[in-house]
Design a protein with these regions (language model features):
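N-terminal secretory signal peptides that target proteins for export/translocation
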Residues: 1-6
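Bacterial N-terminal signal peptides
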Residues: 10-24
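Compositionally biased alpha-helical segments
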Residues: 28-152
Length: 152
């Protein structure tokens, strides 16, 4: 009886420890979403002068792992080049982005106006697109096909 009691007790303790460690882990993502996820809203003009009102804007790109596998990335900043450095300009500080198209092998140049009024010209560091929600559904606008993006 004593051995059986010890086995049941050990199983109970193992279950309690497992539950105690899993509850905080399952609550963490919800906490992070409540604190840091700001939704961005922008008016986007494409190369054909079509304007789209986008909500929940993200910069989207796919990292190629193999010929058939990709890792999707949704960012709330713009990865641009400044010399040899990659600079991540947060959407929070951006007022407007004007896109100057380049050749097929050269990334487009972004003329970025910050909310502070400062401006700069930067080549895009990673080929990607702006994704968001419009009144008609989800929209994916490649950066090389854009003219302007104005954050609201």
């Amino acid at each position: 009886m004593s051995l059986r009691h010890a086995v049941v007790h050990a199983a109970f303790l193992a279950t309690a420890v497992y539950i105690a460690t899993m509850i905080p882990l399952s609550a963490e993502p919800t906490f992070a979403q409540q604190n840091g996820d700001k939704a961005f809203h922008a008016l986007v003009t494409d190369a054909k002068d079509m304007q789209t009102d986008l909500k929940n804007v993200v910069f989207y790109w796919e990292e190629k792992v193999s010929d058939t596998s990709f890792i999707p990335h949704e960012l709330k900043h713009l990865p641009v080049k400044r010399g040899t450095a990659t600079v991540n300009i947060k959407f929070d500080g951006v007022k407007q982005v004007e896109v100057t198209a380049a050749s097929e092998k050269t990334p487009p140049t972004l003329h970025i106006t910050l909310t502070s009024g400062k401006t700069g010209d930067f080549p895009l560091a990673i080929d990607g697109s702006f994704k968001g929600d419009s009144d008609f559904g989800q929209v994916d606008l490649p950066v090389h096909g854009l003219k302007k993006l104005e954050f609201k």
